[in-house]
Amino acid sequence: MHEHQRFDEAAATWDDDPGHEKRQVAVARAIKEAVTLSPRMRVIDVGGGTGRLSILLADLVGSVVVTDPSAGMVRVAQERIEVAGLSDRLRAVQADLTTDRLDGAYDVAWSSMAFHHVQDLDGLLRSVAGLLVDGGRLAIADLDEDPDGAFHADKVDFEGHHGFDRQRLAEQLTRAGFTDVSFSDATTILKDDREFGLFLCTATKAPSPTGRAPASR
């Protein structure tokens, strides 16, 4: 089964899992501690799923575009946004940022547990860098390196990354045009009686000759 299809089928009940809610609350807290947010900021959520992270942080920024390759996730995200009364500032868009081009210039990009599903990570990082203004901030929450693949052991057709080595990810971010790369521990995930670490990585879009200005703070 293709991953997009799996997420399409899981979307309707995804937020029913208390573990997912606990994780997103922890990631939202970590982002608030690591990134200065303001009401004029334009945000893009990369692989935002049901939009829960963006809904949790919505009151701290100006607008958010929640992107996800899964049509099912995007449909649920838009429903959640409307129920939360946030449709004037948040919207969900089906997009795979490794292949699809989006318009706009964003002050912040955030993501939770999405990057490890992306095979072309370098391509995604370059795409996100291209969407950010100079000085724009990136916040990635994802799995620490899981060498034996235990976290995804129940998915025999998983083709993503088994977590990330922090130093290697920092090098990829630098090559993609980011500076000030920093890591912190965000939370842990308990699965099959094992704990898996979740980091928050933040970075800053380096200035470019054709860069775009950030929103007024």
Region locations from a protein language model:
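A short glycine-rich, Lys/Arg-flanked "PGG" loop and its adjoining helix->strand segment in the class I
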Residues: 122-134
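C-terminal alpha-helical "lid/dimerization" subdomain adjacent to the S-adenosyl-L-methionine
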Residues: 18-21, 137-202
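Conserved class I S-adenosyl-L-methionine
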Residues: 1-38, 52, 76, 83
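Short glycine-centered segments of the SAM/dcSAM-binding site in methyltransferase folds
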Residues: 42, 136-137
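A conserved beta-strand element that flanks and buttresses the S-adenosyl-L-methionine
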Residues: 110
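Helix-to-beta-strand junctions that scaffold the AdoMet/dcAdoMet cofactor pocket
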Residues: 86, 118-119, 132-133
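Class I SAM-dependent methyltransferase SAM/SAH-binding core
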Residues: 44-99
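Short catalytic micro-motifs in class I SAM-dependent methyltransferases
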Residues: 113-114
